[in-house]
Amino acid sequence: MNVSKTEQDMRKAIEATAGNFATIRTGRASTSLLDRINVEYYGQPTPLKTLATITTPDASTVLIQPYDPSSLRLIEKTILESDLGLPPSNDGKTIRLNIPPLTAERRKDLVKVLRNLAEEGRVAVRNIRRHAIDEVRKEEKDAKVSEDEARRLQDEVQKLTDKSIQQIEKLFEAKEKEITTV
């Protein structure tokens, strides 16, 4: 049983959760808002950032300039169908997303989405823990490790799990504060 691999997997789960948090809009324009957007381009789901230049000319605008002008309509349609809640404005060459100030109701909705993303991260960490502990038990059953060593490894995995869940909780609290601050 390799504890460092378990630690690495948990770190990846935390990074994935942080990446998901970055896609939640906070009232300020950010290119990371569009990180999860995949456009159906020639039958393939393609990340928007590979189809267009995405910039933030000011604090309340995201500008999308497609490399291929024919993809403009597809990008616009995908953004409309996404959970961003931002209506795109298409001028024929670029798409603008104007980021309105968040309403109290929208802030509450975003915190709910954030809470769900945090829970997904915690579940991922727990699944990694379960897999690691199953591996330790299998090694103990196969007499590859002693009962004491198995207990020590399980305790170590549990400590990593607690630490990882605590990190996800800190990320959640910081992002929640960012969203709820007017």
Swiss-Prot record:
Location within or outside the cell: Cytoplasm
Entry's Gene Ontology BP terms: translation; translational termination
Primary location class: cytoplasm
Matching InterPro entries: Ribosome_recyc_fac (IPR002661), Ribosome_recyc_fac_dom (IPR023584), RRF_sf (IPR036191)
Entry's Gene Ontology cellular component terms: cytoplasm
Gene Ontology MF term list: ribosomal large subunit binding
Keywords, alphabetical: Cytoplasm, Protein biosynthesis
Superkingdom, taxonomy of origin: Bacteria
Gene3D superfamilies linked: 3.30.1360.40, Ribosome-recycling factor (1.10.132.20)
Family: Belongs to the RRF family.
Purpose: Responsible for the release of ribosomes from messenger RNA at the termination of protein biosynthesis. May increase the efficiency of translation by recycling ribosomes from one round of translation to another.
Protein's UniProt name: Ribosome-recycling factor
Source species of the chain: Gloeobacter violaceus (strain ATCC 29082 / PCC 7421)
